[in-house]
Amino acid sequence: MLCIKNGTLHTAVSKEPVLADILIDAGKIVEIAPQINGSFEKVIDASGLDVWPGFVEAHCHIGLDGYGSGNAGADYNETNDPVTPQLRAIDGINAMDPCLNMAAKAGITCFATGPGSTNALGGTFTAIKPNGKRVDNMIV
């Protein structure tokens, strides 16, 4: 288990940040409390540091915009028809898009990514996490 100690937590339930510890087991938060005691595999001292929850990007085109590969990898704005409901983000996501790693480092833990907004009806979005090298392992 991992324990993050003495962090200044910014949460969705309190207007003001709170000083607290966070206990994590198998990648999941299992407890948040003012003080957690015990024996842990790893302890991170977050004294003087701000701790934020993971952010969710509700509308983006990450993995679809061809960043780093140019127009050949741009799979989000189909301009050949104003109505393209058959387009599916899952079919065009580039799991190796460097933007995924950049966004994860910035604290974004989940994305709703999909076809562009050029069309009146542009297709289906997909929710993904920025980890993994294969799209089927990234799907939420």
Predicted feature locations:
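Structural beta-strand/beta-sheet cores of well-ordered domains, especially the beta-sheet scaffolds
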Residues: 5, 20, 89, 124-126
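N-terminal metal-binding scaffold of metallo-dependent hydrolase/deaminase domains
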Residues: 1-40, 49-51
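Hydrophobic/aromatic beta-strand patches that form the interior of the parallel beta-sheet core
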Residues: 4, 42-44, 56, 112
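Short secondary-structure boundary/hinge segments and terminal tails
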Residues: 40, 73, 120-122
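Metal-associated gating/positioning segment near the N- to mid-region
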Residues: 49-115
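Polyanionic/metal-chelating signatures
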Residues: 104-140
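Flexible loop/turn segments at secondary-structure boundaries
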Residues: 11, 63, 119-122
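Glycine/Thr-rich phosphate-binding loops of Rossmann-like dinucleotide-binding domains
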Residues: 32-33, 66, 121
